[in-house]
UniProtKB/Swiss-Prot annotation:
Gene Ontology cellular component annotations, sorted alphabetically: cytosolic large ribosomal subunit
Presence of the UniProt keyword Zinc-finger in the record: no
The species this protein was found in: Natranaerobius thermophilus (strain ATCC BAA-1301 / DSM 18059 / JW/NM-WN-LF)
GO biological process: translation
GO molecular function: mRNA binding; structural constituent of ribosome
Upper taxonomic lineage: Bacteria, Bacillati, Bacillota, Clostridia, Natranaerobiales
The protein's name: Large ribosomal subunit protein bL12
Subunit structure: Homodimer. Part of the ribosomal stalk of the 50S ribosomal subunit. Forms a multimeric L10(L12)X complex, where L10 forms an elongated spine to which 2 to 4 L12 dimers bind in a sequential fashion. Binds GTP-bound translation factors.
């Protein structure tokens, strides 16, 4: 068994408290932060419109607005499409609206939207 697989197996067996302590220890040991990077500021509306066309958006966020009547199917679709664990997918579906995936290509965003809508969710691409 590879070292990576051994570490993954150990992490799978840890409690949430132990995982939190692990993250803190890694932050201290390696001098990094596990916090998500701050989003880039959006350009001001009504800016330079002097004949220059706005650049076409290349990264999209897929936002789940409502899980609908088939919440379990939506959670399963989110879990399968994102690789999240069941607990994370359920937490996402409980705190709506919430981004399912961020900064993905238009094609990936459309595929994800279609899968979640087929399961009964209300999805928006931003």
């Amino acid at each position: 068994m590879s070292k990576v697989q051994e570490v993954l197996d150990i992490v799978k067996e840890m409690s949430v408290l132990e995982l939190s302590e692990l993250v803190e220890a890694m932050e201290e040991e390696f001098g990094v932060s596990a916090a998500a990077p701050a989003p880039a500021a959006a350009p001001a509306a009504g800016g330079d419109q002097g004949g220059a066309e706005a650049a076409e958006q290349t990264e999209f966020d897929v936002v789940l607005n409502d899980a609908g009547q088939k919440k379990i199917q939506v959670i399963k679709a989110v879990k399968e499409a994102t690789g999240m664990g069941l607990k994370e997918a359920k937490a996402l579906a409980d705190e709506l609206p919430k981004a399912v995936k961020e900064k993905v290509s238009k094609e990936e965003a459309e595929e994800l939207k279609e899968k979640i809508e087929e399961a009964g969710g209300d999805v928006e691409i931003k």
